Amino acid sequence: MQTRKTFSWIKEQINRSISVSLMIYIITRPSISIAYPIFAQQGYENPREATGRIVCANCHLANKPVDIEVPQTVLPDTVFEAVVRIPYDMQLKQVLANGKRGTLNVGAVLILPEGFELAPADRISPEMKEKIGNLSFQSYRPNKKNILVIGPVPGQKYSEITFPILSPDPATTKEVHFLKYPIYVGGNRGRGQIYPDGSKSNNTVYNATSAGIVGKIIRKEKGGYEITIADASDGRQVVDIIPPGPELLVSEGESIKLDQPLTSNPNVGGFGQGDAEIVLQDPLRVQGLLFFLASVILAQIFLVLKKKQFEKVQLSEMNF
């Protein structure tokens, strides 16, 4: 009996230890989920500024291409694909937060017209689900269902992202009309250079904060450098801290200028934005167009038949 109680107590302690360890890991691990686009969601009510600039460009300074493909026209209450392509060289490696090299992640923000939103799962076809894969989209804000964000996700697998979109029906949504609408997209690959608070990440170039002579360079145990610069005019010493990641370009005893690069620029990613247009088409207009085309075709057929009949009459009169 005592042995059974002891075994039960040991089992309980082991389970408790595992639970505590798991909680500590979840809290302290460097999760990519706290990266973009959460920064934009926390800092900006709308991801697109009045100038047309998407706010992701404030932290991702390099300009890179992005492409979007949507149908020219869609009917009300239909599901269609918005395909966003974020091209980059898959062989590239980026500097991670710990200074090591790793693969690039990608992310995207899709700004749809009012009324357009993410298609519900039961409206998505199996073919479209296969294109989407394991991606999980979310609204930029609970009250902004027309703005969708995704990422960061592995770039090698998702450099092409398929958004399933549901078009609105003006019959039930009075704010929507049968018009041509713009769609805006922003796509990013790799980490940013600046955090929302204005501080630099380790994925950018570091410049000298003072002119003078490089007196001492100390390599830190966990990576990175402390560079002591002695001002040539007054001898004042300034210490510049370089995080792990960027490669050092200066050496001790070297004379440097203010804002001179102390490191290389390790950034291999960047952000791009683009736009497209889509027409929300009235089904009655489509039906009218089809009726008009059918009437034109019938008129052409009757004209040809009438012409052939006339030619036969002429031929019979000539033979007579």
From Swiss-Prot:
Membrane topology category: Single-pass membrane protein
Any one GO MF annotation of this record: electron transfer activity
Amino-acid positions noted as binding heme in the UniProt annotation, renumbered to this chain: Y36, C56, C59, H60
Cell compartment(s), UniProt: Plastid, Chloroplast thylakoid membrane
A GO-annotated cellular component: chloroplast thylakoid membrane
Membrane-spanning segments: 286-306
Signal peptide: 1-35
GO biological process: photosynthesis
Keywords on record: Chloroplast, Electron transport, Heme, Iron, Membrane, Metal-binding, Photosynthesis, Plastid, Signal, Thylakoid, Transmembrane, Transmembrane helix, Transport
Keyword Transmembrane helix: yes
Primary location: plastid
Cofactor: heme
Cofactor details (free text): Binds 1 heme group covalently.
Record-stated family: Belongs to the cytochrome f family.
Function of the protein: Component of the cytochrome b6-f complex, which mediates electron transfer between photosystem II (PSII) and photosystem I (PSI), cyclic electron flow around PSI, and state transitions.
Subunit structure: The 4 large subunits of the cytochrome b6-f complex are cytochrome b6, subunit IV (17 kDa polypeptide, petD), cytochrome f and the Rieske protein, while the 4 small subunits are PetG, PetL, PetM and PetN. The complex functions as a dimer.
Protein name per UniProt: Cytochrome f
Organism encoding this protein: Daucus carota (Wild carrot)
